[in-house]
Structure formats: C-alpha cells, structure tokens
Amino acid sequence: MRRRDFLLSAAAGAAGARWLGPGSAGLSLAHDQAACGPGYASPREAMAGPREKLLYVVALYVGTGVDAPDYLATVDVDPDSPTYSQVVHRLKMPTVGDELHHFGWNACSSCHADSSVSRRYLIIPGQRSSRIHIVDTHDPRGPTLAKVIEPDEVHAKANLSAPHTVHCLADGQVMISMLGDARGRAPGGFLLLDDAFDVAGRWERGATGMQFNYDFWYQPRHNVMVSSEWAAPTTYSGGFNPQDVAAGKYGQRIHFWDWRERKIIHTADLGETGQIPLEVRFHHNPDSTHGFVGAALSSTIWHWHRVGNRWHVEKVIEIPPAELEDWPMPVPALITDLLVSMDDRYLYFSDWLHGDVRQYDIRDPSQPRLTGRVWCGGLLNRVHPLRERRLVGGPQMLQLSLDGKRLYVTNSLFSSWDNQFYPEMAESGSYLLRIDCDTDHGGMQVNENFFVDFGREPDGPARAHEMRYPGGDCTSDIFA
C-alpha cells in the first residue's frame, strides 16, 4: 500500500487535503496556494507561521504503579480558548508498558517540495516495547490510532530494538534511530519505514566505529548526518550505575556520516569531558555546517562545524557540578535536552539534576553567551517562580515555538531514571509549564498563567515527555 492508498483508507475524502497546523483553519489549501508540501520553504518563513494552538505530549505510566497504557495527550495552548492550559484529549495506546518517549512526523519541511505529502501522521514508538504507533491527526483535537507495527516485525526485518529519534526524510520515508539489536545489545542502527509505514529495513550501510546510538540530525545540502551515543538498552533500561561509565558502557563519541553513502566518515571522541552525548542539533539554516551536542554526564556543550573538508569539534560550555550533603559525589547538572531557535540565535538546554533551564546567545557559535536562566525544580531546591507549587523533578524535554517566544518544558527523563533520582514523581506525576522568552534582548520568565499538572490525570499520575506542535517545531523540521 503506497502513500495515497494509505491516506484514502485512513480517511475517505481527505487524501487530497493538507494539514498545516491549528492556525490554518483546518484542512485547507496551502498558505501559499502553490503546489507545495508540508512545512515551510525556509526558517524565516517558519518563524512567520501561525502561532501554536495545540501541543501533543506523550504521557506514560511505566514505573508509576498504574496499570494503564501510555497515551498521547492533546493540550490546549491557545490563551483565547476556554480550555487553555488543559488536556483536551487522550489517545490511549493498545498495550501496557510501551514507555512512549520520543516521536515525530511522517513529513516536515524537508518534504516541502512534494505536494503529495501532508504533515498528518505522528510516528510514536515505545522505547521499551519497540512497538511503533502511527497516529492520524486528521482531527487535530482528537487524534486516532491508524496502525501499529509490532516489535516482532521490527526484530525480524531489521534486527533492531529500542526506537528513539524520529525524523522524516525528503523522499517520504521515515527514519528512526534504534539503540539496540533485537536482544537489546549495542550498537543498534537506523530503521526505515516506507511511505505506507511498512518496515523497509535498515538505513546504514557502514557503521564502523559506532559503539552506541542515540540521536541524529541531517543537513542534506552538506551531505552530512551527525549521530550521538547513549548506551545499550540492557545497560540504561534498569537505571543508572556510575560503574557502567567506568566500564565503558556509555558513549562519548559523535559520528559524522556521508548522507548519500550512508556510512561514517569521521568520529569525534569527546573524552572524559564529553561523556554521554545525547541530543544533536544543526543550525536550521540549511547552508550552515554549525551544530551542537550536549554531553549529559559531563554537563558540557560541544560545537561543531566544517573547516575545509574536516569537521572541527570544540567544547564551548561547561556547567560545574554542585555539592550536596546527601550525595556521595558532586552532582552533575546533567544536560538532557537542548534546542536551537528557528533563527539560529539562541540555544536552550535543560539541567535535569540541578533544575535550571538556560538560554545562550549563539550568534558566535564558538563563544555562547548566557542571556537567561530560570529554575524549574531540581535537586538544588532553588527558588522558582511557581512558589505555590512544588515542582517535583527537574526540567527535561523542551519545545520552542516557531517564533522563538514560548518554550514549553516537561520533567520526565526515563521511567527507571525518574524513579532513581526523583522517586516522588511516580506519585506526583509530571508538570508541563511555559517559559516566555525575550527574543530581542535575551532573558526568560516562567509564565504563571500556564501549568498542566499530569498528577491529576484520570487514570492516575502520569509522566510527560516529548512535545510536538501540529504545525511543526524547532526539533522536527529540517530544511533541505
């Protein structure tokens, strides 16, 4: 079944329409009335796009003691709506225990030149189960489940497990980073789904030097992809053991790939000050070779760019550890998520253990300048703006509005790690809050009028992780 057949079978009569986000009056003609595909032609055009009115958030019950399936929460983020700052819909997955984690779209701005494509389907994998859910957002306020790819199929056709990052490709396929083989062993690889959401096999042809896998981002104009390393699922799934770091069971490398040849061409070993490199972000400008990666355990930010035919990688930010009386070692900040604003001016990242979110001016990528900082819980117990609420856990996943003015934050990292470092979260649930960003001068402030308490969900307290907008965002759209 090809793309058009899938669209027709999923929603009769809607295959020719294109979903452009909650501000576009539903299923309608494109914003430019031209024969274009989803998303935007450029980052500048994206910044001028409609303001987000809905936010999709994965919520999970793994590790909470609640015997219920994970679900996709639809949150109203339109301040003019009577249901503002509320969960307005919950789509439950069919099976308990998936651990929904990261997710992405079937199409984004990389497919903008293809008028046959629509940004309509969310690909939502289970990190623990390796089950992949295809969710139809034809009704943006009431998504439905369109298809489920069972783990046995993924194991049999690709010998992969533990799906993580989801990116659409310009040819209509979807690529997912996989952290293990069918038995949960490193290094994993990259899974391809075709345009009918069938398993098409593996993407990579040559992965020599890759010991682990995690995140990836590609920049097609420069024929390059960058990937990072966490650990094997058999290592991280039960929680964090510092001895595993000393034993070499966690990554400290990033890999540069030839995008067309699908093989590694350069590996940068970040050493002891680059342990556990997680999220990778290129500039949104497709002509740029600049990008960043956050090394979680070392609490450092690394900048890369191409100099001639070589890739240069340098450490540009380092967050010192903090001393706590009840900890046997200095507490690292633990940088767990980062993103770049659509205009490539600001870098944001979260320090999950310390509890702060930081904003840096990166107009000079080699010399980031701190311009804003807010506290959102964390182990250091610093004062935060929502003083009437005790924020359990630390800031983790981030999502920024296309215009760069609103930063949304959730606090769950991974269920077993949550239970290890923030055991109260299993009973309190997660938060979703909004930080208002000054894009002219720098600076941030928590918005006290927006707060979603996932501790009050109908089936019990839930954990909230990654977020997406129907109209595209700063971590899913890649410009070709």
Where do the model's predicted regions map?
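N-terminal export signals
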Residues: 5-27
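Beta-propeller domains
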Residues: 58-98, 115, 124-148, 206-213, 217-360
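Asp-box/WD-like beta-propeller blade repeats and closely related beta-sheet repeat scaffolds
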Residues: 138-217
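Short loop/turn segments immediately following beta-strands, especially the blade-tip
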Residues: 75-82, 135-143, 303-314, 360-371, ...
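Short, conserved, GDST-rich strand-edge loop motifs in beta-rich repeat architectures
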Residues: 58-66, 116-119, 177-186, 230-249, ...
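Surface-exposed loop and turn segments in beta-propeller and other repeat-based domains
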Residues: 88-101, 148-158, 204-209, 266-273, ...
